Regions:
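Bacterial N-terminal signal peptides that target proteins for export
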Residues: 1-9
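Polar/charged, compositionally biased leader and regulatory segments
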Residues: 2, 20-119, 230-265
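Intrinsically disordered, low-complexity regions enriched for glutamine and histidine
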Residues: 4, 21, 204-206
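Bacterial N-terminal signal peptides
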Residues: 9-17
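Catalytic cores of peptidoglycan-degrading enzymes
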Residues: 103-237, 243
Length: 265
């Protein structure tokens, strides 16, 4: 009896084992291509986060460099070319004029279509300016904003005009056939001030143009690119030594503009 029960259990075990080996697992369902999440109308907090942002900076307006200049002229100021301005070099022996700060609308080439026929300097005699030529009675304009200090006939200059500018420079325009302004007139850059001529010591109609600071002339080509008739983007370092003024044209870095310029030894 026991052997029959044992045989029956063995047979049943073999049948179950055989069925487990032949049965295949049920296939898994494929995942859905999209998942639909449950929708919920959850209100978001309404907040203004602009307080976390920096304020929008205002665009800086570029103005010409202005200096404290003498605007009231004595009779001597109105009759001499080389005149010092007592307000220049009053605190130290260096004045800086950054030409790159002058906007395009606040400067003008003195003879808009002119060409240089005689440069500054020279071997035979020292030429105190440049000679620029176009045609007779062409319009001469002021190089910068300023005040007319002198307008009259003067020796070899003939009819001459001297304009004192707010940037510290003075410009001279001579051999004019006619002066269109008088001392004390305020002029703007590009404003007509005279007509070209050959008055004084001149052999042909042209403009004799000078740049000066504190009465001392220096090369106008430092200020203007004469070939392109454009203002140079340079910084003029003007150093007074006795009665003379040495003018150097240098490139200046932005961080140097924040403090006083210390000239090299």
């Amino acid at each position: 009896m026991a052997s029959k029960i044992h045989n029956g259990i063995l047979i049943l075990t073999l049948i179950l084992f055989a069925s487990c080996r032949t049965q295949k697992p049920a296939p898994r369902p494929a995942p859905p291509e999209t998942v639909d999440f449950p929708t919920a109308n959850i209100p978001l907090p309404v907040m203004d986060f602009n307080f976390m942002l920096p304020e929008t900076p205002e665009l800086a307006v570029c103005h010409s460099p202005r200096k404290d200049i003498t605007e009231a002229f004595t009779p001597r100021d109105k009759s001499q070319i080389a005149i010092k301005d007592p307000k220049l070099f009053d605190e130290n022996n260096t004045e800086i004029i950054d030409l790159s700060l002058i906007p395009s609308g606040e400067y003008a080439f003195p003879l808009p279509k002119g060409n240089v026929i005689s440069p500054y300097g020279g071997r035979r005699r020292h030429h105190s300016g440049v000679d620029i030529k176009t045609c007779a009675n062409d319009t001469i304009v002021s190089a910068f904003d300023g005040i007319v200090r002198m307008a009259k006939p003067f020796a070899a200059y003939g009819n001459v005009i001297v304009v004192r500018h707010y940037n510290g420079l003075e410009t001279i325009y001579s051999h004019n056939s006619k002066n269109l302004v008088k001392p004390g007139d305020r002029v703007l850059a590009g404003q007509p001030i005279a007509l070209t001529g050959r008055t004084g010591r001149a052999t042909t109609e042209h403009l004799h143009f000078e740049t000066r600071i504190n009465g001392v002339h220096f090369n106008p080509n430092i200020v203007f690119n004469m070939a392109k008739r454009k203002l140079r983007s340079k910084c003029l370092v003007c150093t007074q030594k006795g009665n003379n003024v040495i003018v150097k044209s240098v490139d200046i870095l932005p961080h140097q503009k924040a403090g006083p310029y210390v000239p090299p030894p």
